[in-house]
Each structure stands twice: as C-alpha cells, then as structure tokens.
C-alpha cells in the first residue's frame, strides 16, 4: 500500500515531483516524524511437543488452559530445555504483535512499553522476544525487572491435543513512573488491550495504563483498545461500555467480543452500537470478512461506487468512500459503515487464526499515522481541510486491513516477516483501481 511516510525513494504519495508543495517539504533530517505507542504484557509463546506423562507430572489438564505459578513455570521450562522438546519460541502479546506488524508495514517507528528481564540470557525466552521484534520497534523504554516476563506454553500431546499453561511472571509489574509523557504526547495513537486493567490486586499495571490514558487525553492522542477475549468482556460488559465511553476513541474486536460487549450477534449492529461510545470501530468477523464503522462530516460525505449492501442497516455502505473523523471534530456527524469479504476468499489452509485481528489493527494504525505524518509535513494540503482521523476512505482502510489479515492467517507466526508488495502479482490491476 502506498502511504505518505519516509521511504527509501523520494516519492511521496499522492504528490508528484512537479507539485510546488513538495518543494517546500523539508530535507529528511528535518521532516516531522510520526509514531505509535503501545503498552503490553510482555509475553513469549513457547511451543513444545510432550508426552501425556509430562502433562500429568505438572498437574495440567489435557486440552485446557491453566495459569501456573512461577516456580512451576521455571521447572517446566528447564525440563523442556534440558530434553530439547521446544519447537518454537515466539514473541507474543497482542500489543507487541501489533507494534511489530505496524513497524514492518510502515517501515517506521513504534514504541513498546512494558517490562523486560534485566538479565537477558542468550538463547533464552527473553532473548527470543527481543530477536523476534522488528528493529523499528523502539524497546528503549521497557522497564527492567528481576524475574521472568510472561510465558505462554503450548504443549502439544501425543495425539496433537493442545494444552496451555500460562505463567504471568512479572509482566504486570509496569509502574506508572515508567510511562514517558513526551513519547505519548507526540504519538499518533496509544494502543492498549483490555487485559491491562484486569490484574491481581497490588499489581501496578492498571495504574500505569490509566497514567498513559491521562497523558493521551491531555495531548488529544486517540486511545485504541483491543478487546482481548469474549470472557474478559462478558464478565462485566457494563464496565467496558463505560470504559470505552470515558477513555477510548477506537475499538478493535472480533464478532464474539462484539456480542459480549453489546449483546448483539450481528457484527454490523454491534459496530453501530459501539459508535455510541467511540469514534471508530474495527470488527473482524472471521469467514464473513470485516466491518468498519465511524463518523464523517455530513457535508464531506462521499458516496460509494461499490454495490450497495443489504444488512440490518439497509445499504449501510452508502458513504464508505468518506474518510473517518473523531465525533468531537464533526459539526454534523454522520455514521458511516463499510464491509469487505475475506481477501481472495481467504487462505486455502488457515495456518494460524491467532493474530489476524492484530494484523488488521496494524493496517488501520498505519493509515492513521500516515494521515498525521502528511498533516505535519504538508499542512496546507487539501487532504487536511477538516480534522480527519484516517488518510484513506473507510472502504480503502477495510481493503488494507483485510489484506494484512490474510497474510497473517497464511503463516505460522502472528508476526509479519516482511511488508506487503505495492502491487500484487496475483491480482488484476482492477482490484486496486476500484
């Protein structure tokens, strides 16, 4: 996808070299930069093949997910290492994945806040975390801890049955004073997950999260929340509705989380209801593709050239060619919606469903940051006659998010290894011209 942003070549989209505006653009060193910030429970996914006796020995229940104590996790990890049973160690965590994927797509800076072992052993899980994270993700603000970061063990039994053991370690020990005000002040977005505010009593992570939200509000930085799982939301949907209304500008969720939040099992209706609380909604709906919902200025609305779609809201995609705005920036807010079916019908064989939503969110964040970058560097462009949130229309953001999800579904890891090609060999030009 072509976006404004620093590139190896000197072309900026959509301005050509003959454009007089471009001559005012500053040399690279003086160009105003844009970045995003995310807070995560630093987590490593460790995959290992084990026998049934191993699972019984550690008191785990085959096929289920259990939280284990730190000493058990340490013993379990040591045995896996000693016996050479580990098949994969990946950096994980919803926000870590999103920051990494954003940096790969945008070839630009993201900042990750969280904890990291002060003492990193070469070849160990913390080392793997650092190795698996894009070099464009800034890890300089991580807070050191004397102990383990989070570990999620996926133990694959003799018959392929997966058993999960989760050890939080010290992943929730992020302190409010480790949240840098200046980094959040200059960011295009602050990205959070619902897990951050649900911790054991006495853990500082929720307080650190609220501190970050306070800085974001002070500097008018949009707060993005990804909903975690339907169980987290289903526990207390009212709490989350109020949380969204009070603190959040953009929500990302799947159809199950959307139902837990709103009580509606139609992703379109759920997205519409979520607009009562937030400015922009990204809702992935598995094999049904993805939905987006947002606001635009009544005067600036643009009609779609795509076929009008039926649904709970008839012809809901009528103005999907409009660009999204924050509700507070609209004089006469108009609700706009878009939907896209899975890219190329979805992959033939899904390698991994974990992370497709994080991939879609990274694409949306890339578009929002591109808009910010363009506003800072070409402020008198006609693109910025109004305070838009996205650079592209809702329909175009859907297309991009969809393409990135496909890429993640098609690989073993939830983290992209490379950016997307600007033009796809597999598609006729008409797909991109649409």
Name every feature range the model reports, one short phrase each.
Residues 88-101, 350-360:
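Glycine/serine-rich anion-binding loops at beta->alpha junctions
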Residues 68, 349-350:
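A structural signal for short, hydrophobic beta-strand segments that form beta-sheets
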Residues 99-109, 156-157, 367-369:
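Alpha-helix C-terminal capping segments
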């Amino acid at each position: 996808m072509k976006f404004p942003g620093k590139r190896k070549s000197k072309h900026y989209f959509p301005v050509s070299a003959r454009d007089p505006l471009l001559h005012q653009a500053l040399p690279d060193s003086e160009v105003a930069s844009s970045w995003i910030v995310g807070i995560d429970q630093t987590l490593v996914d460790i995959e290992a093949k084990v026998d049934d006796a191993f699972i019984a020995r550690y008191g785990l229940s085959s096929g289920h997910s259990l939280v284990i104590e730190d000493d058990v996790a340490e013993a379990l990890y040591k045995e896996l290492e000693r016996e050479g049973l580990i098949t994969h160690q990946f950096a994980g965590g919803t926000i870590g994945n999103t920051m990494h994927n954003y940096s790969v797509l945008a070839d630009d800076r993201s900042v990750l806040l969280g904890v990291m072992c002060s003492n990193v052993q070469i070849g160990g899980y913390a080392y793997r975390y650092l190795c698996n994270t894009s070099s464009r993700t800034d890890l300089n603000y991580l807070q050191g801890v004397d102990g383990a970061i989070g570990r999620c063990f996926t133990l694959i039994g003799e018959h392929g049955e997966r058993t999960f053991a989760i050890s939080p370690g010290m992943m929730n020990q992020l302190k409010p004073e480790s949240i840098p005000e200046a980094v959040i002040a200059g960011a295009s977005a602050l990205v959070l997950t619902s897990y951050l505010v649900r911790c054991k009593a006495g853990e500082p992570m929720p307080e650190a999260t609220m501190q970050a939200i306070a800085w974001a509000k002070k500097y008018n930085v949009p707060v993005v929340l990804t909903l975690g799982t339907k169980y987290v939301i289903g526990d207390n949907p009212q709490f989350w509705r109020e949380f969204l209304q009070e603190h959040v500008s953009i929500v990302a969720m799947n159809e199950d989380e959307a139902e837990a939040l709103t009580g509606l099992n139609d992703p379109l209706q759920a997205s519409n209801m979520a607009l009562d609380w937030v400015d922009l909604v990204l809702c992935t709906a598995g094999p049904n593709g993805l939905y987006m919902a947002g606001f635009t200025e009544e005067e600036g609305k643009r009609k779609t050239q795509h076929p009008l779609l039926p649904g709970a809201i008839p012809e809901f995609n009528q103005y999907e060619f409009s660009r999204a705005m924050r509700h507070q920036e609209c004089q006469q807010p108009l609700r706009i919606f878009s939907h896209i079916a899975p890219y190329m019908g979805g992959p033939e064989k899904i390698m991994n469903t974990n992370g497709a939503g994080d991939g879609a969110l990274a694409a949306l964040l890339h578009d929002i940051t591109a808009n910010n970058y363009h506003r800072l560097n070409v402020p008198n462009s006609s693109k910025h006659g109004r305070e838009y949130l996205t650079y592209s229309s809702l329909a175009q953001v859907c297309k991009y998010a969809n393409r990135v999800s496909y890429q993640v579904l098609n690989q073993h890891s939830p983290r992209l290894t490379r950016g997307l090609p600007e033009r796809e060999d597999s598609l006729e030009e008409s797909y991109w011209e649409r």
